[in-house]
């Protein structure tokens, strides 16, 4: 691949987990009967970009409808109806809290769902938007601006669900493998950098083929089979 989503340098990251590396490893470990359900947020984008769906697997999300809190109850429904499939719920630290009380439903019905929560300490997509277009005015997106998380370890243990913490790339494979093989529900918290970016990303005013970080103009034109569309300065400045 000329422009791989999972860059070599991502594997060298020492602190926190790189989400692209994480979903690459998750993709490798899941069998072809797995059902993966992702919520709305940065974790959905990272999953769609770097998870390679195998034949027989199913990956669901509400996508453009974007309802935070969808994935967990959807995973519960999938688990009830698909006893022989591994059910993987992909959530964020914000979206899991929309229906976190349903951990009791998982316990009461003995559903072996793997609940993966990617924790970037806030609303990452909105924060990235605020950084790009609002001069880094982080309102209602970070702990400092009013968005905080509970102690997920204590929450999962209060419901009697086994808790796992993945805090760097080196721990991804070992913990995921153990959790996936378990026949019980598992809560897996994945710690990301608070400023973890979605890359590549389309910015205002650019045509869909001209993603950020931008290629040099000569390389971009070389890749194009049709005439290029100029970047709209008017649209960019309006936003």
What are the residue ranges of the model-derived segments?
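Glycine/aspartate-rich loop-and-adjacent alpha/beta segment that forms the canonical ThDP
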Residues: 177-239
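Generic beta-sheet signal
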Residues: 34-36, 85-87, 113, 184-190
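Short beta-alpha connecting loops at secondary-structure transitions
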Residues: 57-61, 98, 127, 133-143, ...
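Glycine-rich beta-alpha junction loops
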Residues: 40-42, 119-122, 191-196
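Conserved thiamine diphosphate
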Residues: 8-9, 131-175
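Thiamine diphosphate
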Residues: 45-124
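Active-site diphosphate/adenylate-binding microenvironment
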Residues: 2-73, 78
